[in-house]
């Protein structure tokens, strides 16, 4: 090494203030250059270091060089001190001046970097050079790549003056636009040179990885990628890695890259060609050869998409996730003990590193070529990418937007549980998906990509898939993207299952194209049995099908309903509901989905549960014409519709998409196609007549479907008139959007004593009034609170409106406020007010095989992020958002129309007949049919009413139930207050009725209802 170079290098490194003294070889060179004999001189000028101790630098040298020259000191001593001092002073001044000039130039250069002054003023020289080189290369990368990124103004032939005039505005606009784009990304942008160094990385990397833009720019990408992912990124980008890892690079870079203490600093001449695209040797010690698009590569084209683990300094606590030895985005040091034993070895390797999984969406950038022949591939200048950061797995709550739904899958990608809101977005119900493999649902062309994502998920613990196509149930496909995370048990660190957050990113496409035989008419193994509204569908999918059967409002909470456990294993629900139903002896009609593989979720049908109507299948394919809204119906289902067409609406899941709020007005392609399957069956004619009479004053379902203009006249006369008109239009339409809960259709048509009839009317009427107290916030219809089944006005006696208004609105607004979309199923709102009439005592004796609500903890049954009320599993309260939906006992032999009874019977059905309720997804607890639906036994509440109001087993919608299952005080007070008032009465029907009427002032309403009812009955037998 030349002494001068050594001196300069040492100065650069800041080891010594004076270049020469610290290096024994360099004095000799200096002396020689002055024309003096080097050897004797060395001895002579080392002498004074003993006697004249005034020169500290020389003292450092005395240790090595003093002994040999001891004899000559006396002779030379008088001549040396002055000369040496001058010489040293001169050399120090020269070095100081040189450094000053260098520093000045460096800082001038730093000021020109496109970085804030606060950053450039703090940079050291090496960083300034590194950033400058990166910036210059980036200009080349942008200008010489294909397509060039130079601005049109400068490259076009426009007048210079025009370009000058508009440039400040353009610059300002571009600056702001660029900032906004970067801030709106769920990740950061980067550009990588052909040798694998970062040319640019956006400042937002600090948000997602906690890393510094300045530190990363110009560094090797491999310094920030998990060791196990190096080969993958090299394959994807066409880089050749050096076999040794960090040392010297390929042929020409070995000297520069590996030499000296430079580490990452390679020699500037190691690039193989001027444009940096040479294929042998690079400036990056990790990379032996620059990017090439080899014909042998498994990738075609310039687009790439893959997941890698990148270093992250963001430490998260509470890690229950695995990222192949490094919990994604978690401090491995304190999380290692949670990983599988197989991963511990990897943890030891890099104990202090945290890694976060990112999806890199890359486009390779070729050099612009002027020849159009293109016989050979143009050289690659590098790669541009967006790195989409996955939400750190330690984040336990993710806000679900209107286009997202959650599934839980097993390690073979078989769906274990699906959220009910899937039916808002796709034409599948949750049961359709449960136990299906994603491989069987995914478009054939995307299967390989899905497989790659699957293996990444198992290896890295988290993955964000690229866009892939999920085949629709009835034809065509929908584009999805899925973020999947492996969830580990907090106790034993076993990997339990995979949580997938699915983003629906398109409408249904090519709906008339059949891509797979599963999209054809249903085969025997995928038949929906019409078993009436029992909706045992909830079979195992905790989230029941909200769309097709009465469970559409169910959400996580309800889903949980079925699960004896919290549904953490989605399978046990069905069994439990079924056995309960069977033991109850109620042949509940339920809609069971028989799926391809008889899993506990899907197909357990036993004679106790299925009524005789089981045999009528509903073809699952939708006719192409109305594929978004209607399913073809068999006779049975059409009959059901006659009885309860309104159910179509009642069962449509409450739109989670804001754009679907008006979904009744405009069919949206994302609405489930099975919306109209009305599972129900014939009821006796007397039942129908009475039901018709009861509902005469309500708008008919037809009106609802067609979304009649809002009618605000709630007077009985106008409503009767309206109903009669509807009846004339459709004489067969027997049911209304409101299903009176107590209506005898639910019971054998035995005549009912007048007092019971009045009490029933009273209770029913109250629920209607409550329901109509205010228009639902979701905009589904004017005054309705019937799970969006009603779009027309409902009758509300004038006196009653104010009495409910405040508490109802308050509860409802609380319910809808916390819901992800701000929308809440009206049914949820209902559940807040339901069961206040549970105190009516009926002479009928009830089964007391009930499980107290505590069997399911509120926390278990309440899943954050979903609009679902807590439903106690088969026992306890069934407060589903749909308590309305299914909790009306279906008549024992017959299938009951699937319509939604209006008085939410959460208090009744679930509590009374928990054992008989197959709390299937919808919270459809069907009790034995011999029991009246409108009376809750007085004892039930004494049995279950918990002392602490915050117990959370009331069905406050999940939006109103916090993580601990507590009802916020604002709701608790009113809500529990009502319950205490009405349910702890002593059981005498008369006294409970009188108390209730005093409390709610419903005497006038009752009279009005009775008049309406008797005038409407037109002599039908009671």
Curated annotation (Swiss-Prot):
PROSITE patterns: BHLH, PAS. The keyword Ion transport does not apply. It is found in: Nucleus. Residues 578-587, 611-625, 987-996 have a biased composition (Low complexity). One of its GO terms (molecular function) is DNA-binding transcription factor activity. It holds the Pfam family PAS_3. GO terms for cellular component: nucleus. It comes from the Eukaryota. InterPro entries: bHLH_dom, HLH_DNA-bd_sf, PAC, PAS, PAS-like_dom_sf, PAS_fold, PAS_fold_3. A motif (Nuclear localization signal) lies at residues 629-636. Residues 86-139 form the bHLH domain. Residues 280-289, 851-864 have a biased composition (Polar residues). GO terms for biological process: appendage development; epithelial cell fate determination, open tracheal system; epithelial tube formation; Malpighian tubule morphogenesis; open tracheal system development; positive regulation of transcription by RNA polymerase II; regulation of transcription by RNA polymerase II; salivary gland development. The keyword DNA-binding applies. Ser-673 phosphorylation by PKB/Akt1 is required for nuclear targeting and transcriptional activity. Trachea, salivary gland ducts, posterior spiracles (Filzkoeper primordia) and a subset of cells in the CNS. Transcription factor, master regulator of tracheal cell fates in the embryo, necessary for the development of the salivary gland duct, Malpighian tubules and the posterior spiracles. It may induce a general fate of branched tubular structures of epithelial origin. Functions with tgo to regulate expression of btl. This is Protein trachealess.
């Amino acid at each position: 090494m030349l002494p001068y170079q050594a001196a300069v290098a040492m100065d650069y490194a800041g080891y010594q203030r004076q270049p020469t003294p610290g290096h024994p070889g360099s004095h000799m060179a200096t002396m020689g250059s002055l024309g003096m004999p080097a050897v004797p001189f060395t001895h002579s000028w080392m002498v004074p270091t003993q006697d004249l101790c005034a020169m500290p630098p020389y003292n450092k040298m005395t240790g090595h060089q003093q002994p040999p020259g001891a004899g000559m000191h006396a002779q030379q001593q008088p001549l040396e001190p002055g000369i040496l001092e001058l010489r040293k002073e001169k050399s120090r001044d020269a070095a100081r001046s040189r450094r000053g000039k260098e520093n000045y130039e460096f800082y001038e250069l730093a000021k020109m970097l496109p970085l804030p002054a606060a950053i450039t003023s703090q940079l050291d020289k090496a960083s300034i050079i590194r950033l400058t080189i990166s910036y210059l290369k980036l200009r080349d990368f942008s200008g010489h790549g294909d397509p060039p990124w130079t601005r049109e103004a400068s490259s076009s032939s426009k007048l210079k003056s025009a370009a000058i005039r508009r440039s400040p505005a353009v610059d300002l606009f571009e600056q702001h636009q660029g900032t906004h784009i970067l801030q709106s990304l769920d990740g950061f942008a980067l550009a990588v040179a052909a040798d694998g160094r970062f040319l640019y990385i956006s400042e937002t990397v600090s948000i997602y990885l906690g890393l510094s833009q300045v530190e990363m720019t110009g560094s090797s990408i491999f310094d920030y990628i998990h060791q196990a992912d190096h080969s993958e990124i090299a394959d994807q980008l066409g880089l050749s890695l050096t076999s040794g890892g960090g040392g010297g690079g390929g042929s020409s870079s070995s000297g520069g890259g590996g030499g000296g203490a430079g580490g990452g600093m390679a020699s500037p001449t190691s690039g193989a060609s001027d444009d940096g695209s040479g294929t042998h040797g690079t400036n990056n010690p990790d990379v032996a050869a620059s990017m090439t698009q080899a014909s042998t590569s498994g990738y075609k084209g310039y687009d790439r998409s893959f997941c890698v683990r990148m270093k992250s300094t963001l430490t998260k606590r509470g890690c229950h996730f695995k990222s192949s030895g490094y919990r994604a985005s978690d401090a491995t040091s304190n999380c290692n003990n949670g990983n599988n034993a197989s991963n511990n070895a990897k943890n030891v390797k890099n104990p202090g590193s945290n890694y976060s999984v990112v999806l890199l969406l890359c486009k390779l950038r070729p050099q612009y070529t002027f020849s159009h022949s293109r016989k050979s591939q143009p050289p690659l200048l590098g790669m541009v990418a967006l790195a989409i950061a996955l939400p750190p797995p330690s984040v336990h709550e993710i806000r679900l937007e209107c286009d997202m739904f959650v599934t839980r899958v097993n390690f073979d990608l078989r769906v274990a549980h699906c959220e009910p809101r899937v039916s808002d977005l796709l034409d599948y119900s949750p049961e359709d998906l449960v136990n299906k493999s994603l491989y069987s649902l995914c478009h054939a062309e995307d299967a390989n990509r899905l497989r790659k994502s699957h293996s990444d998920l198992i290896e890295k613990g988290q993955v964000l898939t690229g866009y892939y196509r999920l085949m629709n149930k009835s034809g065509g496909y929908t584009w999805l993207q899925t973020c999947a995370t492996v969830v580990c048990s907090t106790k034993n660190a076993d990997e339990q299952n995979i949580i997938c957050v699915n983003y629906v990113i398109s409408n249904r496409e090519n709906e008339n194209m059949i891509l797979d035989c599963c999209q054809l008419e249903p085969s025997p193994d995928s038949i929906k049995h019409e078993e009436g509204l029992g909706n045992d569908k909830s079979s195992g999918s905790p989230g029941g099908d909200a769309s097709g059967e009465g469970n559409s409002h169910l959400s996580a909470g309800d889903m949980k309903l079925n699960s004896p456990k919290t549904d953490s294993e989605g399978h046990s629900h069905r069994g439990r509901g079924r056995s309960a139903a069977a033991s109850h002896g109620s042949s509940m009609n339920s809609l069971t989905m028989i799926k391809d593989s008889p899993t506990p979720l899907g197909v357990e049908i036993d004679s106790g549960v299925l009524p005789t109507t089981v045999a009528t299948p509903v073809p699952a394919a939708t006719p192409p014409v109305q594929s978004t809204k209607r399913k073809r119906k068999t006779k049975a289902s059409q009959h059901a519709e006659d009885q309860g067409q309104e159910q179509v609406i009642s069962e449509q899941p409450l739109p989670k998409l804001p754009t679907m709020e008006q979904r009744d007005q405009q069919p949206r392609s994302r609405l489930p196609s099975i919306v109209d399957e009305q599972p129900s069956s014939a009821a006796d004619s007397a039942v129908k007549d009475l039901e018709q009479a009861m509902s005469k004053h309500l708008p008919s379902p037809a009106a609802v479907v067609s979304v009649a203009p809002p009618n605000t006249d709630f007077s009985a006369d106008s409503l009767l008139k309206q109903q009669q008109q509807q009846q004339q239009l459709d004489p067969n339409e027997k049911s209304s959007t409101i299903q009176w809960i107590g209506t005898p259709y639910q019971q054998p048509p035995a005549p009912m004593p007048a007092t019971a009839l009045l009490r029933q009317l009273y209770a029913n009427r109250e629920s209607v009034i409550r329901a109509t107290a205010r228009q639902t916030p979701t905009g589904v219809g004017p005054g309705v609170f019937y799970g969006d089944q009603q779009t027309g006005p409902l009758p509300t006696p004038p006196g009653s409106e104010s009495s409910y208004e405040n508490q109802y609105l308050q509860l409802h607004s609380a319910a809808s406020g916390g819901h992800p979309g701000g929308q809440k199923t009206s049914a949820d709102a209902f559940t807040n007010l339901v069961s206040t009439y549970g105190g009516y005592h009926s002479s009928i004796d009830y089964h007391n095989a009930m499980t107290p609500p505590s069997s399911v903890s509120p926390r278990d049954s309440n899943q954050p992020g979903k609009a679902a009320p807590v439903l106690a599993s088969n026992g306890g309260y069934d407060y589903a958002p749909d308590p309305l939906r299914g909790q009306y006992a279906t008549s024992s032999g017959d299938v009951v129309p699937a319509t939604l009874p209006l008085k939410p019977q959460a208090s009744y059905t679930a509590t009374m007949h928990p054992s008989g309720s197959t709390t299937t997804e919808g919270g459809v607890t069907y009790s034995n049919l011999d029991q009246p639906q409108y009376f809750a036994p007085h004892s039930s509440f004494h049995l279950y009413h918990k002392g602490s109001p915050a117990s959370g087993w009331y069905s406050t919608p999940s939006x109103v139930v916090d993580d601990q299952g507590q009802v916020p005080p604002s709701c608790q007070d009113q809500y529990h207050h009502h319950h205490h008032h009405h349910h702890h009465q002593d059981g005498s029907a008369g006294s409970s009725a009188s108390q209730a009427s005093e409390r709610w002032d419903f005497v006038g309403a009752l009279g009005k209802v009775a008049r309406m009812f008797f005038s409407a009955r037109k002599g039908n037998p009671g």
